[in-house]
Amino acid sequence: MGIDIRHNKDRKVRRKEPKSQDIYLRLLVKLYRFLARRTNSSFNRVVLKRLFMSRTNRPPLSMSRLIRKMKLPRRENKTAVVVGCITADVRIHDIPKLTVCALKLTSGARSRILKAGGQIMTFDQLALAAPKGQNTVLLSGPRKAREVYRHFGKAPSTPHSRTKPYVLSKGRKFERARGRRASRGYKN
């Protein structure tokens, strides 16, 4: 008598639609689903996939990083595309003229880009201007910049681990012996 194959782990877990009920996001999904199907452009497929992502997987992009990435060679006069939010950076004084397309911009970022003579587009405007993603640079924020990633990895109390422990308090008596001082076993 044969053994039934266990089918409970067969499912490929990936999003086929956004979790959000935001009607404007869902309209963009409709548009980019059409473009991904009808054009042979990988740009539209990537944008569609990113529209499905959770907020933690769509980290914000600061203006300083945006400017740095757009200053790279052969990127002048191209549109920066961010499937997420662009945030202002007060440390940056002079902002070049940029053409930007993003899901959201903070009010500070929006005013500074426009003041520098730049242009801000929405994704439906981008679909008309560049239906195949021509002359665009697809950017995203640093996904691993969240504080929670410091706690991931090799266990905190093991040799050569740089993982941040979850501690109740940062006092003298908390997690200060083994692994923190050479006289107590080892020091990382």
Curated annotation (Swiss-Prot):
InterPro entries reported in the protein's UniProt record: Ribosomal_eL18, Ribosomal_eL18/eL18-A/B/_CS, Ribosomal_uL15/eL18, Ribosomal_uL15/eL18_sf
Keyword list, A-Z: Cytoplasm, Ribonucleoprotein, Ribosomal protein
GO biological process, one term: cytoplasmic translation
Chain intervals for the UniProt region annotation (Disordered): 153-188
GO molecular function: RNA binding; structural constituent of ribosome
Bias (Basic residues) ranges: 178-188
Compartments it resides in: Cytoplasm
Pfam family, one: Ribosomal_L18
A single cellular component GO annotation: cytosolic large ribosomal subunit
Main function: Component of the large ribosomal subunit. The ribosome is a large ribonucleoprotein complex responsible for the synthesis of proteins in the cell.
Subunit structure, interactors included: Component of the large ribosomal subunit.
PANTHER family to which the protein is assigned, alphabetical: 60S RIBOSOMAL PROTEIN L18, LARGE RIBOSOMAL SUBUNIT PROTEIN EL18
Family to which the UniProt record says this protein belongs: Belongs to the eukaryotic ribosomal protein eL18 family.
Protein's name in the database: Large ribosomal subunit protein eL18A
Natural source organism: Xenopus laevis
Lineage start: Eukaryota, Metazoa, Chordata, Craniata, Vertebrata
